[in-house]
């Protein structure tokens, strides 16, 4: 079959990347009449596993706050879509969807002015607390388990007929996706023909399409249990000054999970990204540094148990600093570069990208700010 023919009048859409944006795009394609009429075939190409990259974190925030005016409409739409998905598929049960309180805490090693700490944050070191203030209201922040979300939605779209192809994608073009099937020799190369190609491969987008400027911010993560203190549904941005009077602060974001566990996220740094996600090597001292900070932040009465440590790559655009939701000059669609906001903005990105793939005159929000003159 030629790349431009229509087998049974079906349009083949190939999506590179089985993370949250690729999954959401496929889902919203299946919601369109063209799919329900049997006019589309959708294929997701994934190298390792569903949500195997940055979408595989156990807890993440959803909010439209703390963002610039360019990307805020994307988050506003996404939050409405998350609410709809929660009602339709019982997100509270299936991906731990819940509202959360958010706090900013400033702590100091040699603190002399102790601030009041809310009852829900008694697991923090009170003696070092200089400032503790709420961010927004209870309705401004929500949380989900992105990995569970992706796995649930992947099963849902598979029921609807979306096909998953596991293998390492080597090259993409408007009408072809070249890949090596999983667990096959490197010289086992398959060139799949499609009519439209979307690359939503997170930080690995930059390897397939270097001109996009997509790179990976590496973030260390530590997972702890604190069974003797109920942590509630809380998000804490904590700034700790360990250098006396110097204005040098180390920052960590803390997310609660299952009301008895905490996830500490360190400072993102640009890191050499391997071409294969299975070959990621990291500096263990970054985990040690984050663990030292957790020891200083947690109350001495908090009985914490170390559960796990990991690193995740956040895809970011080094050209604009905002997401790319666009097509290249050669006709390849791109959705990547959301950095910290990829989980929040995924449903809106997926919906708009589905509309673009189907050639709609207008998308659900104005995506012009996310268009770039990409490629050759």
Curated annotation (Swiss-Prot):
It is found in: Cytoplasm; Membrane. GO terms for biological process: retrograde transport, endosome to Golgi. Its main location: cytoplasm. The chain crosses the membrane at residues 11-31. Keywords: Cytoplasm, Membrane, Oxidoreductase, Transmembrane, Transmembrane helix, Transport. It is a single-pass membrane protein. Putative oxidoreductase that negatively regulates the retrieval of cargo from late endosomes to the Golgi. PANTHER family: OXIDOREDUCTASE TDA3-RELATED, SARCOSINE DEHYDROGENASE-RELATED. This is Putative oxidoreductase C6G10.06. It comes from Schizosaccharomyces pombe (strain 972 / ATCC 24843) (Fission yeast). The lineage of its organism: Eukaryota, Fungi, Dikarya, Ascomycota, Taphrinomycotina.
């Amino acid at each position: 079959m030629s790349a431009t023919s229509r087998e049974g009048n079906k349009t083949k859409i190939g999506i590179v990347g089985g993370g949250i944006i690729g999954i959401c795009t496929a889902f919203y394609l299946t919601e369109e009449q063209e799919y329900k009429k049997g006019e589309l075939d959708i294929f997701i190409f994934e190298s390792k596993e569903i949500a195997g990259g940055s979408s595989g974190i156990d807890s993440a925030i959803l909010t439209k706050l703390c963002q610039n005016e360019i990307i805020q409409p994307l988050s506003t739409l996404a939050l409405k879509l998350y609410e709809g998905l929660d009602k339709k598929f019982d997100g509270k049960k299936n991906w731990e969807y819940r509202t959360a309180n958010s706090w900013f805490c400033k702590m100091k090693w040699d603190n002399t002015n102790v601030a009041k700490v809310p009852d829900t944050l008694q697991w923090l070191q009170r003696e070092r607390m200089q400032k503790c203030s709420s961010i927004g209201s209870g309705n401004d922040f929500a949380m989900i388990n992105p990995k569970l979300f992706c796995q649930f939605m992947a099963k849902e779209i598979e029921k609807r007929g979306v096909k998953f192809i596991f293998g390492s994608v080597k090259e993409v073009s408007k009408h072809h996706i070249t890949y090596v099937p999983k667990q096959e020799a490197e010289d086992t190369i398959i060139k799949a023909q499609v009519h439209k190609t979307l690359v939503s491969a997170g930080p690995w987008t930059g390897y397939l399409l270097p001109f996009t400027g997509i790179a990976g911010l590496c973030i260390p993560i530590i997972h702890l249990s604190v069974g003797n203190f109920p942590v509630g549904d809380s998000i804490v941005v904590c700034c700790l000054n360990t250098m006396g009077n110097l204005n040098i602060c180390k920052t960590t974001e803390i997310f609660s999970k299952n009301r008895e566990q905490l996830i500490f996220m360190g400072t993102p740094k640009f890191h050499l990204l391997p071409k294969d996600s299975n070959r990621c090597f990291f500096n263990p001292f970054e985990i040690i540094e984050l663990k030292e900070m957790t020891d200083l932040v947690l109350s001495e009465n908090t009985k914490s148990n170390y559960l796990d440590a990991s690193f995740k790559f956040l895809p970011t655009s080094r050209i604009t600093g905002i997401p790319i939701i666009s097509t290249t000059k050669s006709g390849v669609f791109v959705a990547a570069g959301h950095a910290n906001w990829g989980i929040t903005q995924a449903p809106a990105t997926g919906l708009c990208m589905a509309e673009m793939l189907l050639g709609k005159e207008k998308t659900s929000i104005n995506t012009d700010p996310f268009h770039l003159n990409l490629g050759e």
